[in-house]
Amino acid sequence: MSHSSTTHRDSWKSNWGFVLACIGSAVGMGNIWMFPTRVSKYGGGTFLLPYFLFVIIIGLSGVIGEMAFGRATRSGPIGAFGQAIASRGKNPKIGQAIGYLPVIGSLALAIGYSVIVGWILKYAAGSLTGSVLAQADIEGFGQAFGQMAAPFGNNFWQTVGIVITFIIMVCGISGGIEKINKIIMPLFFFLFLGLAVYMAFQPGAAEGYRYIFRIEPEGLADPMTWVFALGQAFFSLSLAGNGTLIYGSY
């Protein structure tokens, strides 16, 4: 890559903004939806023990490695893998072909997430207007969600989500992603802090906490506990995709 192509490249303006953006990249639907389900299914603390073990191991190796890879090449996955292969005296197109794999994977995730973001925006607006709670029973809520989740059932809010995302991306790293994360991530933290306080005073909370921190040796002998803990660690650290490598390149 030429010197001129890196001189005018956007970059992070603060360490704080970079850290918040990395957290925002990692803490996604895989943690908010899937993590509680797996903790409940695989024994609470029995699942958390291998999970935190994998987070430490992968964090000290994979995440740092991906970030260093992006920082060294100053490029996304296609260019980064192309440079890596070229440095070994081989055809860079081989590396570029490898780099397309995480790009295609991220595109598939983005398509699915755009639908979910549309749901979130619709429910957020409905919580302000009161329409979310307008249904009389569980069946009513189910029918309302089914209509929204049907093909073309939520086009407006899905389009709004895509437009907002596009505007943030057009504003660049420092003017878009970094700025929005400095606002959204603290709000996200206080939202979940308030939720944690609320749940602590609900009936049965003590039993739930005991379950979360209890470790059952027989559960640790189940290989699926370790398999899903490893998979969850990858989700939590946003590894093997584009995010960490691309953020490191800036």
Language model features with spans:
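Membrane-embedded translocation segments of transport machinery
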Residues: S2-W12, W16, E178, K182-Y250
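Inter-helical loop and helix-membrane interface segments of multi-pass membrane transporters/permeases
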Residues: T6-D10, R38-Y42, A72-L101, S114-S174, ...
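Extracellular loop-to-transmembrane helix junctions
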Residues: D10, S40-E66, G153-N154
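Alpha-helical transmembrane segments and their helix-start/interface "positive-inside/aromatic belt" motifs
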Residues: S11, G17, G44-F52, K93-G112, ...
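Transmembrane helix-boundary motif of multi-pass solute transporters/channels
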Residues: S14-F54, N242-L245
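Hydrophobic alpha-helical transmembrane segments of multi-pass membrane proteins
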Residues: L20-A26, F52-I57, L101-G112, V160-I167, ...
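Transmembrane alpha-helical segments of multi-pass membrane transport proteins and ion-pumping complexes
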Residues: M29, G59-V63, R71, L107-G118, ...
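Hydrophobic alpha-helical membrane-insertion segments
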Residues: F54-V63, L101-A124, L187-V197
